Amino acid sequence: MRFGYWLPVFGGWLRNVPDEGMEATWDYVRRLAQRSEQIGFDLTLIAELNLNDIKGPDAPSLDAWSTAAALAAVTERLELMVAVRPTFHPPALLAKQAANIDRISGGRLTLNVVSSWWAGEAKQYGVEFDQHDARYARTAEWLAVVSGMWSASRFSHAGTYYRVEDAILEPKPVARPRPTIYAGGESEAAKNLIARDCDAYLMHGDPPERVAAKVADMRARRTRADGGLPPLKFGVAGYVVCADTDARARAEVARITDVRQSAAGYANYQDWLANTQLEQQVSLEDYSVSNRGLRAGLVGTAEQIAQRIAEFERAGVDLLLLQFSPQYEEMERFAAEVIPLVEELTAGRRAPAR
């Protein structure tokens, strides 16, 4: 199992808690990233939104791509998974930008391709907002251009959304044939695109048995898409509540899901529901923690959480994308108390046959 975490570019993950003690500042995320690679974390996911989805649109948020470039220069081994929305980035230009950051990092840049859902944000920033299935048609073409720019000495493309003529991109990314491309989605259009064109499938929080069914479904789609493609990898997002006792952990969950505390973080709730296609309905209580994080069930003592993570590994998951609050302190606790237990529980599964 690899351990990743969401970089707190929004200053937290809890819509009901205005101040989580982790400001959306360069100083905080730099210290967090540098410490994280020292204590056993493998990857950070840098979300891309120009408005703050968690604390309300008026609150500060960090830009994903300039933050990634800065982190590339001040970290040594941490994988930098940067979210990118095709409607906000022309593909040839993004391919050039990403290749340069990948070189700065020594080959540690990867992409999380995300189809836009926030119509209000797109309007504010003067960006075209496609309807749902059109977004995935655009994304498929966008991926073809990015991959072509990364692989060909000269690349041309004439499609519905993009046109590139005899373009040169040098230097290429370090990773060959390309940096890893992650993506998530629950609609048929999203899942078929990911099975065909991406390297890894990311899922919001769900119990391990539900995740296992999704893994099996995506593996079958991958086989149908092209039997020659390498196997997909799988990641799950989750919010961690680790405490000395299960009762204390449950009390913390009750506190952070009290929807009466704050209204600012719910400003875009209806917009999000209207512009996504989900397999399950999401209540306000679910929405109170980012990315349905509590559904992963990473709540309890260190021993309980480690057992849950072992269940995810058995379900086919090889990457966790975790959220914590307050993040610096709780990541330290997770690294000290949970990761060693997970390694003990899963060592037998990874041991080579003799």
Predicted regions and their residues:
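N-terminal beta1-alpha1-beta2 module of alpha/beta enzyme domains
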Residues: 1-74, 174-179, 353
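Acidic (Asp/Glu)-rich catalytic clusters
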Residues: 37-38, 68-77, 98, 102-109, ...
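Conserved, mostly hydrophobic/aromatic
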Residues: 3, 36, 40, 71, ...
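Hydrophobic faces of well-ordered beta-strands that scaffold small-molecule active sites
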Residues: 3-5, 44-46, 80-84, 109-113, ...
